């Protein structure tokens, strides 16, 4: 089973949401990214997501910005394949980001 940020494992049968307020490797295993929810403390707070384990070697998937003090859900038209894991780089003025993802085993079975 794919790993989780806390070192546990996640069954490959459902989407999950991982919240964070700091830079974080969401998973080291292949996965699909379904969307993000950005909670910013100021307009323009930003979060950048990568296919990989860090910002330096990962493939940038996109930078997502939010308005202040509201939930900013960002859905993707279709899941994005992340073959090298998912890394989130929390930028300025972010209270929390919720990363919606699922292990690749589930994605392949759908």
Walk through the language-model features, giving the residues of each:
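Short proline/glycine- and polar residue-rich coil/turn motifs
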Residues: 64-70
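Tight coil/turn sites that cap or link beta-strands
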Residues: 20, 69, 83-85
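Exposed aromatic-hydrophobic patches
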Residues: 71-79
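C-terminal interaction-tip segments
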Residues: 2-30, 41, 91-110
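Noncatalytic modules at the cell exterior or secretory-pathway interfaces
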Residues: 34-36, 79-94
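Short, surface-exposed beta-strand/strand-loop-strand elements in extracellular ectodomains
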Residues: 42-62, 98-100
């Amino acid at each position: 089973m794919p790993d989780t940020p806390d070192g546990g494992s996640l069954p490959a049968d459902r989407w999950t949401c991982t919240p964070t307020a700091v830079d974080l490797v969401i998973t080291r295993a292949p996965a699909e990214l379904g969307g993000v929810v950005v909670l910013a403390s100021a307009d323009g707070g930003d979060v950048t997501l990568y296919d990989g384990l860090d910002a330096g070697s990962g493939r940038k998937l996109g930078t997502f910005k939010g308005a202040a003090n509201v939930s900013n859900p960002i859905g993707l038209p279709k899941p994005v394949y992340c073959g090298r894991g998912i890394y989130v780089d929390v930028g300025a003025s972010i209270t929390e980001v919720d990363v919606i993802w699922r292990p690749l085993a589930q994605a392949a079975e759908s």
